[in-house]
């Protein structure tokens, strides 16, 4: 599944199969010398325009049908089958089609660290099958999530097309400054084992909210019917717009009710994204199924302690005179609309503000700013939630800064995780804006 430059999100049929040593791949019958798929070729195509002016011309809708000559290219399919893992869908055919039809010359590839092992392979495939004038650039900077799509760096490198792997279309395509293709890298897992595990551990009639990262989103929707028919488990995929149904991010998740759900089930490895749903829904028990280890575990989060720590930080920040406003520059993490809103409100409350741009935020770095009494960071909310205690001075999220100024509320142990929701702070909005009542 992927999002294309037309803005359509859809599934594809191309499924790569198991990898092998590149040296053992069969010889190509093509007259072009065969690469070993271990690096990128030299040379660069014409530089793309670096204009940041948004094109407002409405273009006609185009059907993105991948030509048979690409889908049925025997040499291409052999390379995919022998160099990339069979259960990871890198959508190579679609990528080649978009590059060709848009006449792109210099391609930027951006992916999280876990996929960089395949970066040079994909780079070589694109260069060989898109033509001799094509060059690629692998963007090796850290990519934490969908907020890190880095079109600005791609433009600075002279690229005219960006392929962003393993994250959903969090940053709208029409706001990105060059052509972009989001490749979700959907991963196939053993759904039979999932159904057996759930059937053994959960009672018939259990109301399950199933969530996961975008890689496992197709699996979530496949499991819904199977769990109902084979285990009697009523499974639904909650949604917070504009994310997909069942999709959860470390900073953004759906708010659920105990009247509707008995449990939250997260499909994926690690806890980072699951913790978002746990923080947003502290009264609903949470479980995690790891498709790699095939383990099902009950997960816990100390909501009381977390909220207590954040309330103390907010209270301490209230006494500040000078507040540093951090704009994250890692990809698209920072939102200038959010920054401007916060600065205006802080100044109106009598706080002196200073804006600091940082790609990554560390305690030692902020300690250098001795004249700042407290910080508000427009980058990643989880940085404050998870690591705020490690900073010498309060490090607030935009939401917490609004609570500090009595522009939002933090009641009891309820802590919202809607940063990139449709009306979230990550989009320059105020989700719980106070409405003026006419008298």
UniProtKB/Swiss-Prot annotation:
Residues binding [4Fe-4S] cluster: 147, 251, 380
One Pfam entry name: Diphthamide_syn
Catalyzed reactions per annotation: L-histidyl-[translation elongation factor 2] + S-adenosyl-L-methionine = 2-[(3S)-amino-3-carboxypropyl]-L-histidyl-[translation elongation factor 2] + S-methyl-5'-thioadenosine + H(+)
UniProt key word Iron: yes
BP GO terms, sorted: protein histidyl modification to diphthamide
Pathways involved: Protein modification; peptidyl-diphthamide biosynthesis
Segments for region (Disordered): 11-54
The protein's assembly and partners: Component of the 2-(3-amino-3-carboxypropyl)histidine synthase complex composed of DPH1, DPH2, DPH3 and a NADH-dependent reductase, predominantly CBR1.
Entry similarity comment: Belongs to the DPH1/DPH2 family. DPH1 subfamily.
Name listed for the protein in its UniProt record: 2-(3-amino-3-carboxypropyl)histidine synthase subunit 1
Taxonomic lineage: Eukaryota, Fungi, Dikarya, Ascomycota, Saccharomycotina
Gene name as annotated: DPH1
